[in-house]
Amino acid sequence: MVYPVRNKDDLDQQLILAEDKLVVIDFYADWCGPCKIIAPKLDELAHEYSDRVVVLKVNVDENEDITVEYNVNSMPTFVFIKGGNVLELFVGCNSDKLAKLMEKHAGVYTDEAADVKAVHIDGECIVDLTAESSESDNDNNNVNEVSAHDENAVLEH
């Protein structure tokens, strides 16, 4: 089951109730396309690991204080917490990586899960909350996007 967090006090209470279980916080927005893409997989994983994992959803538009506290700049962002400690962060909508991280931190450890790094950003599948809408700002902060599959790509400035 995925639990929608209402506010900071609610989040704090859910973290206490989780005790020694893994907590996965999904930072999302209703208007975020990548968030909608990964939501069904998150629901599936929450059901599959319900005995070991608590999945919480935090709407960034309704809970700015929590979003700032966890330094969330893009969506979807998944924060993995156990025993009150942040273990790992994953940004993007790659459902395979999300599943591997759940396996890794929920105690279902595989060699494949061991290859997962501490911070993951799937740049093809995020919404950047820090992006400026002004064209002049975008010109000053020229960001070049390259497909993760294009090994021969060259960035031009």
Swiss-Prot record:
Keyword annotations: Chromosome, Disulfide bond, Electron transport, Nucleus, Redox-active center, Transport
SUPFAM superfamilies: Thioredoxin-like (SSF52833)
Function, as annotated: Probably participates in various redox reactions through the reversible oxidation of its active center dithiol to a disulfide and catalyzes dithiol-disulfide exchange reactions. Its tissue specificity suggests a regulatory role in the germline.
Region annotation Disordered: where it falls in the sequence: 132-157
PROSITE patterns from the UniProt entry: THIOREDOXIN_1, THIOREDOXIN_2
Keyword presence, Nucleus: yes
Covalent S-S links between cysteines: 32-35
Keyword Disulfide bond: yes
Basic and acidic residues: compositionally biased ranges: 147-157
Compartments where found: Nucleus; Chromosome
Gene Ontology molecular function: protein-disulfide reductase activity
Superkingdom as given in the UniProt entry: Eukaryota
Protein name: Thioredoxin-T
Note: The TrxT gene, which encodes an testis specific thioredoxin, is adjacent to the dhd gene and shares some regulatory region with it.
Tissue: Testis specific. Not expressed in the embryo. Becomes progressively more strongly expressed during larval and pupal development. In testis, it is strongly expressed in young spermatocytes, and postmeiotic spermatid stages, then expression decreases at the nuclear elongation stage. Strongly expressed in the waste bag, in which material no longer needed for the mature sperm is eliminated. Not expressed in the stem cells and spermatogonial cells.
InterPro entries: Thioredoxin, Thioredoxin-like_sf, Thioredoxin_CS, Thioredoxin_domain
CDD domains: TRX_family
Example of a GO biological process term: protein folding
Residue ranges of every copy of the Thioredoxin domain listed in the record: 2-107
Family: Belongs to the thioredoxin family.
Record GO cellular component, one term: cytosol
